[in-house]
Amino acid sequence: MTSGTVKCHFCKKDDSEDKGQPIWVGCEFCDGWCHLTCVPIQFVVPKLENPSQLLAFKEKHVESFKCTLHDESKCALLKLNGVSVGTEDIAFTKRNRLRNKRPIDYIALNEGNDKRLKHEHPHTQAFLACFEKWKDPKAISSSELESDFQIIKVPLRVSDPADSGMYVISANELGLVDSKDHVKLNVEYLTKIMGDDYPLDVMDVQTQMNEKWTLSQWNEYYSHTSPSDRDRIRNVISLEVSHVESFKDGIRRPNAVNNNDLVDIVWNFGRTETDIERPKVTKYILMSVGNAYTDFHLDFAGTSVYYNVISGSKKFILFPPTDYNLKKYREWCDNDNQNDIFLGDQLEAGIAMELTEGNLFMIPCGYIHAVYTPEDSFIVGGNFLTLRDITTQLNVVEIEHQTKVPKKFTFPQFESVMGKTCEWLLNSDHIQSISSEDIENLVKYLSSSNIKYKPINYQSKKELITELKNKIIKFEHT
């Protein structure tokens, strides 16, 4: 509960007077509220022996609540999970079956969020309205994507994905199904490939928080539970699979990505036996059920993204990394009421894109975006840094620092990638391919005492920085 004006239907105290009452429940037919422990036990199913038993129940046990205003005999009804309803309860269900019953998310509510629906994020309607405002389905050919990559600054759908180099192996090619036809990869087949016990983070859409599941649990939820029987809306957006044998060649990125991935370019430059592991961000499988929503965010380090829809559909709203938009984004991240604010209404110059099965989508560096899933979807995508976007990437990393993004959600080994990039630039002819502003920002970044990088071809970080500064002077005199 967050509102200070709502009073308990039974004790009449509002939430500023509730003396630590742990749980509120909301009527599914009006805006009535009450403390769980205030519900008279004669109105509770299953039948309880004394009121103190209500203290043992938590928000997860609440199935539904109807206040006294919706019963001719002024009876309320609180149903708790795992209950077999009796004759009177069945009659209640029949009388009200045509009502617009909207299941309440009691877990989100008692974690400090306002009253909301279990199967719809509170920003969904605002997102859809904003989507119509900015809808602009721009496309580009694969050949143009490759030839013009350095100057592309807007999100674009690739009109001919089959010619882009993008490839995702099929279930029949993996021998998972006996068919000569193309059978798309799905959650069921993914579970067979990676194993029932493979761990993954599953996001609860309402709270935007992750839970630890196994693939078998996710498969049961996604593949074998009907939408009406799913307890909550969930999605998986952080399953990286580049290390999986079946996907090393079984997933291939677009040529434009392979040609411009900064880690690919610099990682093996001057490599030593003691080098740390290459960042694993190149191949993700993303799985969402219908009505899933991911609120506005920046991909770590402002990375560019490729996004291939294997099945289902997606809706994106994206905003460019202008100074104005990034300022609003920082303010929103720092706002204690962040979850109650739809950021899309505050940003400028948006682009909205709807993606369907087979589509390939490219998101440039630094775009602030939110994603809605109209139907169950299975996606293959990945992130990559570029030489083109050095300054914007460094700006986003600074925003991550300012907004205290946990290290787990930042680009892995980013410091090493930037250090290797500097050494690669100084030992090649590629220094001319970036601006003096980019070099100045690299110098500023590496000069921070918080950045720990041990150069491969220089005695110290200080010597590396000195060489970079000398390059800036040469730029200024040419």
Swiss-Prot record:
Its main location: nucleus. Its cofactor is Fe(2+). Substrate binds at residues 294, 314. Its EC number is 1.14.11.27. Residues 242-401 form the JmjC domain. It catalyses: N(6),N(6)-dimethyl-L-lysyl(36)-[histone H3] + 2 2-oxoglutarate + 2 O2 = L-lysyl(36)-[histone H3] + 2 formaldehyde + 2 succinate + 2 CO2. The keyword Phosphoprotein does not apply. Histone demethylase that specifically demethylates 'Lys-36' of histone H3, thereby playing a central role in histone code. Binds 1 Fe(2+) ion per subunit. The JmjC domain mediates the demethylation activity. Keywords: Chromatin regulator, Dioxygenase, Iron, Metal-binding, Nucleus, Oxidoreductase, Transcription, Transcription regulation, Zinc, Zinc-finger. GO terms for cellular component: nucleus. It is found in: Nucleus. It is an enzyme of class 1 (oxidoreductase). The lineage of its organism: Eukaryota, Fungi, Dikarya, Ascomycota, Saccharomycotina. This is JmjC domain-containing histone demethylation protein 1. Fe cation binds at residues 297, 299, 369. InterPro entries: JHDM1_Histone_Demethylase, JmjC_dom, Znf_FYVE_PHD, Znf_PHD, Znf_RING/FYVE/PHD. GO terms for molecular function: histone H3K36me/H3K36me2 demethylase activity; zinc ion binding. A zinc finger (PHD-type) spans 6-70. Belongs to the JHDM1 histone demethylase family.
